[in-house]
Amino acid sequence: MPIWSPKGRAAAGVVASVLFIVFFFLPLAVILMSSLSQQWNGILPSGFTLNHFVNALHGAAWDALLASLTIGFCASLFALLCGVWAALALRQYGVKTQKWLSMVFYLPSAIPSVSVGLGILVAFSQGPLQMNGTLWIVLTAHFVLISAFTFSNVSTGLARISADIENVASSLGASPWYRLRHVTLPLLMPWMMSALALSLSLSMGELGATMMIYPPGWTTLPVAIFSLTDRGNIADGAALTIVLVAITLLLMMKLERIAKWLGQK
């Protein structure tokens, strides 16, 4: 049965729906039930309570939320700035040079985050750029891990902008700086906002590298969730997970809506 036939498409849709329910919806539903239950000793939880969410919005958990938002926005904005600059700079080179330089930007995404964290920890624990024990080392790790995705989004958007538009602006006497500010960047803005949304969601959920380098006072939500569940406090960890998922989804939806609005202007 070919996949492009009506029956094939219907079967593929059913399989995709089942896989989505089994591997995404059900685990998330279990986490939600755990966060709302007083105890879970049998097949299903017993009792209903919001105390776990109250705990998730106070004290150390609240500090972890603020730390995740601060690190996520700072690292994402810096990655976006560098991604735009790199994508614009690569346009000046030939196809082969662009291919090899792009591989350099994509390389961090192919390396396990734990390896990135260890490398940054070793590299910046001594010497003139010592950042161990500071916020900067966490920002550096997050920037390295998300920069490839930002660069990819911006490069895709830049490739879809016709060179004729910029050529027309140049023929009308626009300087390179004026052309960048008033032609290229406005057209590129939807992809920039999409890149920001993606990088922010990746930063908010990063755990592997952060576990190795985070300093006191900058515990992120994933680290806090891991610590709670590692101590056996599953319910509070589940509540904090729901908070993380909800905030990340809301931020992504808002940024994607802004990107869609900018694309229609």
Swiss-Prot record:
The keyword Cell membrane belongs to this UniProt entry's keyword annotation: yes
Pfam families per record: BPD_transp_1 (PF00528)
Location, primary (coarse class): membrane
InterPro entries linked: AminoethylPonate_ABC_PhnV (IPR017661), MetI-like (IPR000515), MetI-like_sf (IPR035906)
CC terms in the record's Gene Ontology section: plasma membrane
Transmembrane as UniProt keyword: yes
Subcellular compartments: Cell inner membrane
Domain of life: Bacteria
Keyword annotations from UniProtKB, A to Z: Cell inner membrane, Cell membrane, Membrane, Transmembrane, Transmembrane helix, Transport
Gene Ontology BP term (one): transmembrane transport
ABC transmembrane type-1 domain ranges (all copies): 65-253
Transmembrane feature ranges: 13-33, 69-89, 104-124, 131-151, 185-205, 233-253
Lipid bilayer topology: Multi-pass membrane protein
Task performed by this protein: Probably part of the PhnSTUV complex (TC 3.A.1.11.5) involved in 2-aminoethylphosphonate import. Probably responsible for the translocation of the substrate across the membrane.
Family affiliation: Belongs to the binding-protein-dependent transport system permease family.
Protein name: Putative 2-aminoethylphosphonate transport system permease protein PhnV
Organism: Salmonella choleraesuis (strain SC-B67)
